[in-house]
Amino acid sequence: MAELRSNMITQGIDRAPHRSLLRAAGVKEEDFGKPFIAVCNSYIDIVPGHVHLQEFGKIVKEAIREAGGVPFEFNTIGVDDGIAMGHIGMRYSLPSREIIADSVETVVSAHWFDGMVCIPNCDKITPGMLMAAMRINIPTIFVSGGPMAAGRTSDGRKISLSSVFEGVGAYQAGKINENELQELEQFGCPTCGSCSGMFTANSMNCLSEALGLALPGNGTILATSPERKEFVRKSAAQLMETIRKDIKPRDIVTVKAIDNAFALDMALGGSTNTVLHTLALANEAGVEYSLERINEVAERVPHLAKLAPASDVFIEDLHEAGGVSAALNELSKKEGALHLDALTVTGKTLGETIAGHEVKDYDVIHPLDQPFTEKGGLAVLFGNLAPDGAIIKTGGVQNGITRHEGPAVVFDSQDEALDGIINRKVKEGDVVIIRYEGPKGGPGMPEMLAPTSQIVGMGLGPKVALITDGRFSGASRGLSIGHVSPEAAEGGPLAFVENGDHIIVDIEKRILDVQVPEEEWEKRKANWKGFEPKVKTGYLARYSKLVTSANTGGIMKI
């Protein structure tokens, strides 16, 4: 074991004042000289994925003490993307990731901890803590709060939060009545935990396993299961071993590890937000990773599992089928799909970790020779509409559609788009453009779950494409193309599109183009008046000035 970092505040005559303060915080004489462990929690009452994390913090601290460490718990902020959806609150969601990363870095660096247990769960909390872990680079393990159980209607049909969002669109289209919508509302979110489909939170918690920063089960053991509490205890104890072996996050998160994370993402059809967050993680880890490389991973990794919102299979079903380790083990049977020699938090390789984890239900995790598609569930599109890339969740596209052409229907905000969709300004075959909703323009790159849910609920899901410099909830599905870079607020091509322009989306060829004569296009660019920030004060104003486009992970300029 390396020399303890905490010696900086515990050892020597000149540290008597520091020890005096530590004694006041409950540190005993025999604790000096033991590893000081940061327990980075994200308990918060208003987020259902986090209401139970206070109990998990207690379990972690008990396990740390039993294993010979001294735990110190602190908390981060958190935003519930579902509750923040559809109003100004969503502008704060992605920016909260940076606050979380900064706050964790601040607390841990200021107090010279020797190791860290991160207890995240929902959308921006996990990536924020991951980013901080890369910056601090002390032995760290991730322990998510676990997924919510799927809801069930009175007829036994499994549902989730996305069912409720889509139910609103269905009700407004006259497809269901008020009682049916009320039933979806009552039963869509039956327990604590991260929402029950392969949405952003669960995607990131599963990717933490593939990255090697969490033990098997992190992404799939239900929040309310006794197995989850035992998992929390086991993970905390593992951290003490990781400290003894002096394994740090940057030893684990390499190009190979990020390839593995995206390979899992492709196999499970994870949220498009994983691209944004993993690119930000790579940046903090000092790893160069391009969007083109993501397409290379997609070319060699098949799509093996289709989960909600793309199907009626939920995270609980994935767990029963063997979880992430089983999916990775199945994937490992294809040569070159994974880097099996990648290091994990236990000191074992990924190959050693997943060995023997066989698939228990091939209806949930398809066998390698019977994939949903030969290519992975995410794709990066390029073209004159997205010179620096755009992301689509191919695993969420219905009916195997790979190409769409149609006229643009342009909206300058999500609110404007929602109004237009509800008032039938969008029809079959159209390409909806929602711009000025990127990291700078939004500000905060809000999720477009409400517009996509309206489109699906009104029966237009497979018949309309939606393109935005904003992003999508993991609960979104359909021909939803986000993260268009550079964004409109930066003078990206999306700013110059007009109603009726012919748009081409070709998933197979990875193309996103607009067909406008060059002379006309240059005229539009010359006439563009620039972007006026929507928010002039507070954190969002600072964020808007400092943030970069989605192709960099939406990170802040230094």
From Swiss-Prot:
Enzyme class: lyase
PROSITE patterns named in the record: ILVD_EDD_1, ILVD_EDD_2
Modified residues (N6-carboxylysine): 124
Residues engaged in binding [2Fe-2S] cluster: 122, 195
Keyword Lyase carried by entry: yes
Pathway in which the depicted protein is active: Amino-acid biosynthesis; L-isoleucine biosynthesis; L-isoleucine from 2-oxobutanoate: step 3/4; Amino-acid biosynthesis; L-valine biosynthesis; L-valine from pyruvate: step 3/4
Reactions mediated catalytically: (2R)-2,3-dihydroxy-3-methylbutanoate = 3-methyl-2-oxobutanoate + H2O; (2R,3R)-2,3-dihydroxy-3-methylpentanoate = (S)-3-methyl-2-oxopentanoate + H2O
Alphabetical GO biological process terms: isoleucine biosynthetic process; L-valine biosynthetic process
Gene3D superfamilies: IlvD/EDD C-terminal domain-like (3.50.30.80)
Enzyme Commission (EC) number: 4.2.1.9
Active site (record annotation): 473 (proton acceptor)
Cofactor annotation comment: Binds 1 [2Fe-2S] cluster per subunit. This cluster acts as a Lewis acid cofactor.
Cofactor: [2Fe-2S] cluster; Mg(2+)
Positions of Mg(2+) binding: 81, 123-124, 447
Keywords on record: 2Fe-2S, Amino-acid biosynthesis, Branched-chain amino acid biosynthesis, Iron, Iron-sulfur, Lyase, Magnesium, Metal-binding
CC per GO annotation: cytosol
Subunit architecture: Homodimer.
Record NCBIfam families: ilvD, PRK00911.1
Family, per entry: Belongs to the IlvD/Edd family.
Name this polypeptide is given: Dihydroxy-acid dehydratase
Classification lineage: Bacteria, Bacillati, Bacillota, Bacilli, Bacillales
